A protein has these predicted regions:
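Gly/Thr-rich phosphate-binding beta-strand-loop-beta motif of the actin/hexokinase/Hsp70
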Residues: 2-25, 107, 238
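Glycine-rich, often acidic, oxyanion-interacting loops/wings at catalytic, nucleic-acid
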Residues: 138-224
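Phosphate-backbone recognition surface of nucleic-acid-processing proteins
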Residues: 224-227, 233, 238-323, 327, ...
């Protein structure tokens, strides 16, 4: 537990400018305003701190786009800084006193009065890079979808043969179609431009996928997540990149809520209306949480129902559907269960049995093929069977051999 500082600084920051309100808290029962500084350039923030702020201080920063980078800059200069949620001062704003310096003042007073019960967690430099890779993959996929829709729209509008859904062969097939149908003029120029952009994004997505796969290969915790049915290496990477430290979640349900799998419950008043606005009517989730984790684990839930129906989790899902439950709700419920299992894996809890060992080995062989035999040999690995056996030994090596009666069917 750190000692309380003498000075408390509230900071309201924007993309280029920031304002700080400095409070002297040497008298714990009577904090007083020390100084206010407005319209500070972010580039000159450290120099301003060195001239005006005592090292025995804490800076309270409202959560925003650049708050994590500001915290790192202050920490590197020797100042303590913490990030708080943006709603900390929501009830303290006044219609006639809304400005940056008042927000900075309210942040400092919120800390002094004990209204801040926790700080926002910020990732390490390594995991910040992992998140950047995940965001780059997400943005590339979005741009590919937009371009694919534009190509489809143009072909439909002009009466050309509609492209296939397979991204890998789409460009080559459409270029052959341009030659065969003798498309000319501006339509040809526009279509070729769209295909060129789509091909560039496809190559970028392939490079990012390979990079993610190699990161997962070098991270034992991410590899252990692959023992879950329906979870591919991108889902394992997205979850671990978002979590980093699983011990900040005291229970599995808190990790599930963080991953976006907090169900809408029957409530009243503003809470219910807010949940409906975020999640939509008749949707199973409340719309909060990390969308990247939610996407991959919802996809994992669909995979369990379609390809892993003979597993224990798949049988449970189909039992719920046969009882009349909505398929979407069952998919979300399976995704939530997978996140619950992930919480135990990330914390290092031992695998309970060998029921999924053969499934894990098959998954490791597929993962080996994803990276490619040539690259795996360059990284120092043997054949795919040797790789699968070695990884399975790390996960299941200390467990007793399963008997035929107790072994779970894992046809996935």
């Amino acid at each position: 537990m750190q000692d309380e500082p003498r000075y408390v600084i509230g900071m309201d920051a924007h993309s280029r400018k920031l304002a700080i309100s400095i409070w002297d808290w040497s008298d714990r029962f009577n904090a007083c305003m020390h100084r206010e500084l407005k319209c500070i350039d972010i580039d000159s923030m450290i120099k301003t701190y060195e001239r005006n702020v005592n090292i025995d201080s804490i800076t309270i920063i409202e959560s925003s786009t650049n708050s994590a980078s500001l915290k790192k800059m202050l920490n590197a200069a020797g100042y303590r800084a913490e990030i708080v949620r943006a709603d900390v001062i929501a009830n303290k704003e006044r219609k006639r006193r809304i400005c940056d310096i008042r927000d900075a003042e309210n942040l400092a007073l919120a800390y002094i009065k004990g209204d801040i019960d926790e700080f926002v967690w910020t990732p390490s430099q390594e995991y910040t890079q992992y998140r950047d890779i995940m965001f780059a993959y997400r943005d590339t996929t979005k741009e590919m979808t937009r371009l694919s829709n534009r190509i489809w729209n143009m072909c439909s509008r002009k009466g050309y043969k509609l492209p296939i859904r397979n991204s890998t062969n789409k460009v080559s097939i459409l270029r052959e179609m341009i030659i065969e149908t003798n498309i000319e003029g501006f339509a040809k120029e526009q279509l070729e431009m769209l295909l060129e952009d789509f091909d560039r994004l496809l190559q970028r997505k392939t490079e990012l996928s390979r990079r993610i796969a190699e990161i997962v290969l070098s991270n034992p915790r991410m590899l252990r997540l692959l023992q879950l049915h329906g979870v591919n290496y991108k889902g394992a990477f997205a979850l671990d990149a978002a979590v980093e430290n699983p011990h900040r979640f005291s229970t599995a349900s808190k990790l599930s809520a963080y991953g976006g799998f907090s169900p809408i419950v029957d409530s009243s008043g503003e809470e219910e209306e807010h949940a409906k606005r975020k999640g939509g009517l008749k949707k199973p989730l409340d719309g909060e949480g990390r969308r990247d984790v939610k996407f991959f684990f919802t996809e994992a839930g669909q995979t369990v129902l379609t390809s892993c129906a003979n597993t224990k989790l798949g049988k449970w899902g189909w039992k719920m559907i046969n009882r009349g439950k909505s398929r979407n709700k069952v998919v979300c419920a399976i995704g939530r269960k997978l996140l619950t299992y992930s919480w135990h894996i990330l914390r290092g809890d031992s695998t309970p049995n060998r029921h999924s060992e053969e499934f894990f080995k098959r998954k490791m062989r597929t993962f080996y093929q994803t990276i490619g035999a040539k690259r795996m040999h360059e990284l120092g690995y043997g054949t795919r069977n040797q790789f699968a056996e070695a990884q399975a030994k790390l996960v299941y090596g200390d467990l007793p051999i399963s008997t035929a009666d107790s072994e779970e069917i894992a046809d996935c």
